[in-house]
Every structure is written in structure tokens, then in C-alpha cells.
């Protein structure tokens, strides 16, 4: 699964 931190890291790009 994908963690919230991973989602935020991609969204921050």
C-alpha cells in the first residue's frame, strides 16, 4: 500500500 507520507511527497512535486 502507499503511505500518507508517500502521497504527500509526490503531491509536493
Curated annotation (Swiss-Prot):
Removal of H(2)O(2), oxidation of toxic reductants, biosynthesis and degradation of lignin, suberization, auxin catabolism, response to environmental stresses such as wounding, pathogen attack and oxidative stress. These functions might be dependent on each isozyme/isoform in each plant tissue. This is Peroxidase 2. Keywords: Calcium, Heme, Hydrogen peroxide, Iron, Metal-binding, Oxidoreductase, Peroxidase, Secreted. One of its GO terms (cellular component) is extracellular region. It is found in: Secreted. Its EC number is 1.11.1.7. Its cofactor is Ca(2+); heme b. It comes from Betula pendula. It comes from the Eukaryota. It catalyses: 2 a phenolic donor + H2O2 = 2 a phenolic radical donor + 2 H2O. Transmembrane segments: none annotated. Its main location: secreted. Belongs to the peroxidase family. Classical plant (class III) peroxidase subfamily.
Amino acid at each position: 500500500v502507499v503511505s500518507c507520507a508517500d502521497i504527500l511527497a509526490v503531491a509536493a512535486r
